[in-house]
Amino acid sequence: MNSGINYVCVATEMKLYLPYLKMLLPELVILGLNEKWEGFITKYKLLKHYLSLDEIDDDTLICFIDAYDVLPTKNIIDFERNYKEFIKHHPDVKMIVGYDVVDNVVHEHLCQDIFGTVDNVRLNSGQFIGSAKNIKEVINYILDNTSNFQTDQIELTKYANTFKKEVYIDVNHDFFYVKSRPLKQVVLPTTGLNSAGAGAGAGAGAGSGPAFIHANGNGFLNDFLLKEHGIYISDKERIFHFIENVKSVLKKIIIYDLIYIKKHLRLFYNLLLNNFKINGHTINEYDKDLPLRQELQ
């Protein structure tokens, strides 16, 4: 595919839908293959190094996508044109990111509590597009100003709240269609997408719809592959996908539970510091260097 966009992902191994992503997007650059995963910060560290390469000019368009659960749609042929048309109308935007949709109300509440929101809208960090210069500035700022990197989604949400004009959340699914359906099939909806085209909802001009679909939260893209690209996944591979995704879901539950617990423990601790009094003084007034305080910062 001839494109002025550099497509990049981070993956330590070739599994799940990554082989199909590479098949459908041969120019895809895979960072971190066969390397050790060191947590979510690995994504930004590897991407930062990639953006520093001599062959990457400031004006190079960079589209980052998650490796294991994202695939291109047929609309990708209009992706570059739609992006440039959008930026023409929104020059302050440094990055377009996905908008995460969840069917389950409880799931949505937990996601908002863990990852945070931007004006009550929840972005998804698993796909974004912008110039190399702008992406580099965003990533460098996050890495330079984050002492405790939790997940790329949490840190990007913090950035978006600080610099709201710089991050556009694709609420109309003009560029990315993101759906959180753990262990369920994700396909493009037959209705509800902006049929007027990419960016039309924000006055950017005509297009054809989202260029990528993201089965966020360990969803399946088997039905999408068959319907959109005529690619059939065997029963054996489907079983493998199911097992891999179940394992990943369990890992995420542990990781996100720890984040959730620590967040609420921090709130309780601060409440205790400022409200529990001894001899008329709060604990906060007695000692500002408590070990637990330092641990929860």
Spans of features found by a protein language model:
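A conserved donor-nucleotide-binding helix/loop in the catalytic core
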Residues: 36-65, 71-75, 123, 151-160
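N-terminal anchoring/stem segment of glycosyltransferases
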Residues: 1-61, 250-253, 257, 263-293
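A generic structural motif
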Residues: 29-37, 95-100, 151-155, 170-176, ...
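Conserved donor-nucleotide/metal-binding helix-loop-beta segment in metal-dependent transferases, i.e.
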Residues: 71-115
